[in-house]
């Protein structure tokens, strides 16, 4: 029978000092011997997705203590990618994922916690906590802060739905008046919560449901809705159940590596492709799989992308639907239910909400469940009242959206497309692959041939786009922005937004060894691997080269001869210490980021640390 990890610091005369310190935190005599449950909260006043999380730890702690455990909360950092974007702050976003993972490991192992509740929400926080959970392999459950309500405003007497990307595009579009731009800005992000579309934060919170590590509704229930309170309380109760199963009954199915196994990673990626999730999710799933010691690779993602249809289309791919609409249509369980009926899921995978995924779907998939409470749960809707408070409203839709022909979630027969929302491309530009969010690409752009316009940094690319250097037919190449070359693998939402604002959104392509915000749409190809700083071919592209992109064929090609490519590589290598470095780029890189770059791998490995360098 597994012994409580916390016994290391609570049992025996030699631990008198540790017990004295535990007592100083409020632990009583009759508490010793109970499981100690760590609550990793990511509350911060910097991030709208986290501004309402301050009291969530206490909520979860109360449920844990009622169920017979000891709850101890600590905090992690949380970077807001939207606020950090467009300047040097974005260099810190992806590296913060590793910092969060390490900080969770440090706190849990230093204090011998027995189990873990992860209160996350935004872009790098959920992945960082997921990596730590799978590294630690102790009972865990995730509960996120929930999505923001979609913005709404009237322009030209027409009610429109908005999100962060609309504000960014309008701000850079000279055709939009100052008054309209300000109105969009003030309306785009009305409440607390993670940005309202299928961007990275919401994509990752949805994927925790498919991985089996969070409760139904975690990815879609609005941050403002009163029903979300119960998710936090139930997370506290469930973690005690998981801890009891493992420590008292030796049930290893309660451990995260047995829940998030290969089948679960396939389920999560299948969901991701079906819902057109953020391309960043590929990066994070690959990283999490390595922590779980699961052999899940880009080859698996490529294979699944050819099988899975696009069943749910959400902003930024369409202005019609946001996360509040996904929830009304049955949330993640609604999408998984359709995938299950299409025989595309492993429904025998374990799940924290039930015996296995099949049992959870039987209750929570609105297309098959007749549970009135479940239908009421998915009727939770927005109030349209600006607020930073959680659980501040209890508005409901008149009915759920169970229209699988023309609704937000479709059956396979009526899919938005029979090919999914993400694809892996490869070719001489990206020998180890790259990622495109096909859900956001117009069909006429699925094949594209253009002339390369090369930039050594995101900043130079932005200047080129806004300065009129980039014209229709160009393939904008932004390199040395990968995990090592940036360092930090910046998101390229500003370049893509500015292309749209200049009317070039469907007239140009963009490829980069950096990455894209979940808010990106258009022919935007990221995660090019190997990255330029690691000797990738993208570092050899020259302005004027022809680049051929063919999404149906899953290919991306630099149209020069192998002889010419080899000659360019030889010339680059001849530069010695100056090889594979950006020409003329001026960028201050802090010591912390230099340390990150030393161990960073390219995106096809999830941009995790190359631990072989530590041997």
Swiss-Prot record:
UniProt binding sites for [2Fe-2S] cluster: 122, 195
Gene3D superfamilies per record: IlvD/EDD C-terminal domain-like
Keywords of this entry: 2Fe-2S, Amino-acid biosynthesis, Branched-chain amino acid biosynthesis, Iron, Iron-sulfur, Lyase, Magnesium, Metal-binding
Disulfide bridges in this chain: none
Binding site for Mg(2+): 81, 123-124, 491
Signal peptide location: none
EC number(s) reported in the record: 4.2.1.9
Cofactor note: Binds 1 [2Fe-2S] cluster per subunit. This cluster acts as a Lewis acid cofactor.
Domain of life: Bacteria
Cofactor section: [2Fe-2S] cluster; Mg(2+)
GO cellular component: cytosol
Molecular function GO labels: 2 iron, 2 sulfur cluster binding; dihydroxy-acid dehydratase activity; magnesium ion binding
Pfam family, one: ILV_EDD_C
Pathway: Amino-acid biosynthesis; L-isoleucine biosynthesis; L-isoleucine from 2-oxobutanoate: step 3/4; Amino-acid biosynthesis; L-valine biosynthesis; L-valine from pyruvate: step 3/4
GO biological process: isoleucine biosynthetic process; L-valine biosynthetic process
Catalytic activity from the UniProt record: (2R)-2,3-dihydroxy-3-methylbutanoate = 3-methyl-2-oxobutanoate + H2O; (2R,3R)-2,3-dihydroxy-3-methylpentanoate = (S)-3-methyl-2-oxopentanoate + H2O
N6-carboxylysine modification, residue list: 124
Stored InterPro entries: Dihydro-acid_dehy_C, DihydroxyA_deHydtase, DiOHA_6PGluconate_deHydtase_CS, ILV_EDD_C, ILV_EDD_N, IlvD/EDD_N
Similarity section: Belongs to the IlvD/Edd family.
Subunit annotation: Homodimer.
HAMAP family associated with the record: IlvD
Biological role: Functions in the biosynthesis of branched-chain amino acids. Catalyzes the dehydration of (2R,3R)-2,3-dihydroxy-3-methylpentanoate (2,3-dihydroxy-3-methylvalerate) into 2-oxo-3-methylpentanoate (2-oxo-3-methylvalerate) and of (2R)-2,3-dihydroxy-3-methylbutanoate (2,3-dihydroxyisovalerate) into 2-oxo-3-methylbutanoate (2-oxoisovalerate), the penultimate precursor to L-isoleucine and L-valine, respectively.
Name of the protein in its database record: Dihydroxy-acid dehydratase
Biological source species: Shewanella pealeana (strain ATCC 700345 / ANG-SQ1)
């Amino acid at each position: 029978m597994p012994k409580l990890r916390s016994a290391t610091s609570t049992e025996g005369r030699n631990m008198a000092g540790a017990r004295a310190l535990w007592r100083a935190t409020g632990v009583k005599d009759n508490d010793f011997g109970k499981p100690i449950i760590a609550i990793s909260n990511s509350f911060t006043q910097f991030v709208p997705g986290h501004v309402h999380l301050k009291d969530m730890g206490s909520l979860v702690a109360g449920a844990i203590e009622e169920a017979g455990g000891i709850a101890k909360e600590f905090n992690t950092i949380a970077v807001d990618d939207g606020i950090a974007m467009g300047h040097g702050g974005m260099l810190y976003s992806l590296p913060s994922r590793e910092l969060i993972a390490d900080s969770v490991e440090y706190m849990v192992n230093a204090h011998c916690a027995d189990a873990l509740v992860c209160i996350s929400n935004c872009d790098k926080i959920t992945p960082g906590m997921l990596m730590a959970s799978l590294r630690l392999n102790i009972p865990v459950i995730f509960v996120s802060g929930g999505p923001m309500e979609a913005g709404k405003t009237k322009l030209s007497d027409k009610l429109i739905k908005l999100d962060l990307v609309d504000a960014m595009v309008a701000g850079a579009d000279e055709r939009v008046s100052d008054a309209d731009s300000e109105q969009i800005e003030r309306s785009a992000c009305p409440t607390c919560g993670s940005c309202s579309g299928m961007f990275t934060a919401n994509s990752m919170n949805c994927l925790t449901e498919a991985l089996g590590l969070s409760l139904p509704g975690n990815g879609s229930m609005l941050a403002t809705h009163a029903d979300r309170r119960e998710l936090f309380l139930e997370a506290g109760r469930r973690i005690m159940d998981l801890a009891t199963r493992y420590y008292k009954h030796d049930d290893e199915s309660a451990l995260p590596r047995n829940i998030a196994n290969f089948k679960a990673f396939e389920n999560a990626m299948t969901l991701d492709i079906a819902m057109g999730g953020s391309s960043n999710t590929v990066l994070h799933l690959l990283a999490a799989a390595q922590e779980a010691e699961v052999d899940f690779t880009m080859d698996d993602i490529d294979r699944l992308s050819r099988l899975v249809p696009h069943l749910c289309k959400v902003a930024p791919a369409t202005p019609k639907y946001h996360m509040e609409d996904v929830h009304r249509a049955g949330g993640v369980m609604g999408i998984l239910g359709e995938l299950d009926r299409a025989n595309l899921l492993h429904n025998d995978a374990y799940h924290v909400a039930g015996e296995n995924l099949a049992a959870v779907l039987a209750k929570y998939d609105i297309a098959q469940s007749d549970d009135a409470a479940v239908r009421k749960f998915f009727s939770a809707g927005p109030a349209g009242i600006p607020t930073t408070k959680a659980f501040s409203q209890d508005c409901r839709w008149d009915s759920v959206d169970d229209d699988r022909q023309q609704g937000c979630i479709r059956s396979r027969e009526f899919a938005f497309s029979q090919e999914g929302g993400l694809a892996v491309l490869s070719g001489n530009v990206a020998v180890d692959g790259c990622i495109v969010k096909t859900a956001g690409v117009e069909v006429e752009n699925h094949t594209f041939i253009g002339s390369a316009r090369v930039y050594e940094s995101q900043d130079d690319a932005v200047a080129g786009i806004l300065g009129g250097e980039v014209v229709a037919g160009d393939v904008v190449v932004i390199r040395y922005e990968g995990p090592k070359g940036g360092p930090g693998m910046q998101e390229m939402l500003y370049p893509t937004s500015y292309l749209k604002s200049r009317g070039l959104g469907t007239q140009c392509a963009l490829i980069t060894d950096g990455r894209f915000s979940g808010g990106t749409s258009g022919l935007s190809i990221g995660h090019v691997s190997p990255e330029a700083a690691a000797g990738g071919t993208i570092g050899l592209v020259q302005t004027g080269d022809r680049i051929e992109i063919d999404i149906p064929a899953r290919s991306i090609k630099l149209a020069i001869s192998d002889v010419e490519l080899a000659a360019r590589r030889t010339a680059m290598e001849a530069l010695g210490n100056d090889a594979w470095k950006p020409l003329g780029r001026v960028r201050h890189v802090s010591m912390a980021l230099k340390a990150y770059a030393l161990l960073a791998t390219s995106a096809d490995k999830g941009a995790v640390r190359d631990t072989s360098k530590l041997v």
